[in-house]
Each structure stands twice: as C-alpha cells, then as structure tokens.
Amino acid sequence: MTNVILLVLIAVAIFVAAAFLYVSRIISIPPQGRAVDYLNSKLKNNQRVIACIGDSLTHGNIGQSWIDYLRKGFPNDVFLNEGINGNTVWQVIQRVDPILACKPDIVILMIGSNDAMGSFNEKSGLRYKRNNNLPEAPSFDKYKEQLTDLLDRLG
C-alpha cells in the first residue's frame, strides 16, 4: 500500500511540474501581431492601425485574447497586441517607440494592474522592482506621473 501511495505522489508531482512548465512557457511567449511584425510587413494603405498596449490583461491568457476577437470582427483593420505579462507603466514607456513608429490611428491602453499590485505594501513593491528590473518600486504617485508621461507620448 505504501508503494502505491508513493507512486501516486510521484505521478502527481510529475504532472504538476509538467503543467507548471507548460503554462510558464506559454505565458512567456510574446503575443502575435506586435509592432515589430507590423513594421516588417507590407499592408494595404486603407487599413486602420489599432495599437492595444498594456500588460497581461492586453496580452491575453493561454491561447485567447480579446484582441483576437477584434481581429475577427474587424478584418480590414490591423490590431497590434503590445500586451506584455507583468508590465508596469514604466516598462510600457520603455518600449513605446516601435509602437509609435507604426503611426496607430487608435490606441487602446490597459495598464496599471501591476503598478497597483506593486503599490500594496513595501514587500510587494520591492518584489515588483526586483522581478521587473524597475528603477524604483511602484507607487500610486509614480503611476500617475508615468501615466501622464505615457499619454503625452501617445498623444
């Protein structure tokens, strides 16, 4: 009986490890249809470019993204998925130049959930700073300042 329990525990551990590795790999893959892809492609002149910028809420979850639904609903438009899991507004500012080079007609901005998570307390702020290579821990005041800077750049 003990051997059976041990084998079941080993099988469960292997399954959990494999599932974790699978999900980790999927969420680390950048979304399809990024600004770099657009800049390297030949598109029709009459297509509107819609830049969707943000964090994991923009990037989408495993295999699905609200941007994919927009692409299906508006097939004559180009939707850039510039959602990167875990990003803060500071990180979006650091990568906005290729997006601006696409000269988007419309920008959909969804950013701030990771800034909020990093602003809860000092421990979470330091964790976000370390894990995301931020110059400083997220804070509500920094978010307002950086969001204003980002909106100025996008405007």
What is each of the regions a protein language model found here?
Residues 1-53, 58-62, 68-73, 77, ...:
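N-terminal secretory targeting modules
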Residues 76-90:
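A short beta-strand-loop structural module common to alpha/beta enzyme folds
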Residues 63-64, 120:
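Conserved catalytic-core motifs of eukaryotic protein kinase domains, centered on the activation segment
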Residues 53-55, 82-85, 110-113:
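Active-site-proximal beta-strand/loop segments in catalytic clefts of secreted hydrolases
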